[in-house]
Regions:
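C-terminal long alpha-helix characteristic of the crotonase
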Residues: 95-100, 142, 151-198, 204, ...
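CoA-thioester-processing core
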Residues: 61, 65-67, 75, 81-135, ...
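A short acidic, glycine-rich active-site loop
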Residues: 45-56
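Terminal low-complexity tails and localization/encapsulation signals of metabolic enzymes
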Residues: 217-230
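Acidic, divalent-metal-coordinating active-site segment for phosphoryl/phosphodiester hydrolysis
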Residues: 138-144
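Conserved CoA-thioester-binding segment of acyl-CoA-metabolizing enzymes
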Residues: 1-27, 49, 63, 151
C-alpha cells in the first residue's frame, strides 16, 4: 500500500545518511509471501487518479531502493508477485527459497508492471525471457530463476534470511566508498537513465481502456476476463 511504499522510501533515505550502514536485507513476514504486490481493489475503486498515485509510489520507492548506496539483498521467502517481484528486482542480490514463486502477472488483469519490471527484468534475464515472463504471465520457480539469472542463489525453505544476512555481513569487509562507486558505475552502464519513469505514463493510460476495467473486475469476481481489445 501507499504507506508501505512511502515507508520504504523514507527508510532508504535514512540509511543513506547513516555512515554505519552499508547493507540492507528485505524479506517478507510469515512463510508464504515475500510480497503479493499491489491490492487490485485500490485500482478498481479509485480509478485513474488512484492508478497514477499508486504507480508513482511504486516507481519512487523502488528507484530509491535501487539507488541505495550500499548493498541491498532480497531474501525471497515465498510468492513474489507483481510489485513484490519488482521490489526484489530493485535489490542488488536476490536469494530465493525452494518454495518461492516469481511472476509479473499484470497483463492478466489488463495492467502492466509499474515498478520497473519491464525495464529492469530484461537486463537480468535478457529480452527473450523478460517477454516470456511478462507477456505470458508464466510463474517462475527458483531452479529456472537461477538458470536464467533472475536470482543469484537458491536455498532450502526457511534459509533465505540467514543466507542474505551472511551475504550482508561480508559487505563489512568491503570499502563503503568503493561499494557506492561501483554501484554507480554499474548503473551508468544501463541504456536508460530513468527506467522507473518509463512505465508511468503507459500504466496510467491503461485506465482509459475497457480491458483494464474488465481485467480487474474479472479478477475480483474470480472469473475469466472477456477481452475486447478496447
Amino acid at each position: 500500500d501507499l504507506e508501505s511504499l512511502s515507508g520504504l522510501e523514507e527508510i532508504i533515505e535514512l540509511l543513506n545518511k547513516d555512515d554505519e550502514v552499508f547493507s540492507l536485507v528485505i524479506t517478507g513476514q510469515g512463510e508464504k509471501f515475500f510480497s503479493a504486490g499491489a491490492d487490485l481493489k485500490v485500482f478498481h475503486e479509485g480509478g485513474k487518479d488512484a492508478a497514477k498515485e499508486m504507480s508513482t509510489a511504486f516507481s519512487q520507492a523502488f528507484e530509491a531502493l535501487s539507488k541505495f548506496r550500499g548493498v541491498s539483498i532480497a531474501a525471497i521467502n515465498g510468492f513474489a508477485m507483481g510489485g513484490g517481484l519488482e521490489c526484489a528486482l530493485a535489490c542488488d542480490i536476490r536469494v530465493a527459497e525452494e518454495k518461492a514463486v516469481l511472476a509479473l502477472p499484470e497483463p492478466k488483469v489488463g495492467l502492466l508492471p509499474c515498478g520497473g519490471g519491464t525495464q529492469v527484468l530484461p537486463r537480468l534475464v535478457g529480452e527473450g525471457w523478460a517477454k516470456r515472463i511478462i507477456l505470458t504471465g508464466e510463474q517462475i520457480k527458483p531452479d529456472q530463476a537461477l538458470k536464467i539469472g533472475l536470482i543469484e542463489e537458491k536455498v532450502e525453505d526457511g534459509k533465505s534470511l540467514d543466507t542474505a544476512m551472511s551475504i550482508a555481513s561480508s559487505v563489512a569487509n568491503q570499502s563503503p566508498s568503493s561499494i557506492s562507486q561501483c554501484k554507480d558505475l554499474i548503473h551508468k552502464a544501463r541504456l536508460s537513465n530513468e527506467p522507473y519513469k518509463e512505465e508511468l505514463e503507459p500504466f496510467v493510460k491503461l485506465f482509459d481502456t475497457k480491458d483494464q476495467k474488465e481485467g480487474v473486475e474479472a479478477f475480483l469476481d474470480k472469473r475469466k476476463p472477456n477481452w475486447q481489445n478496447a
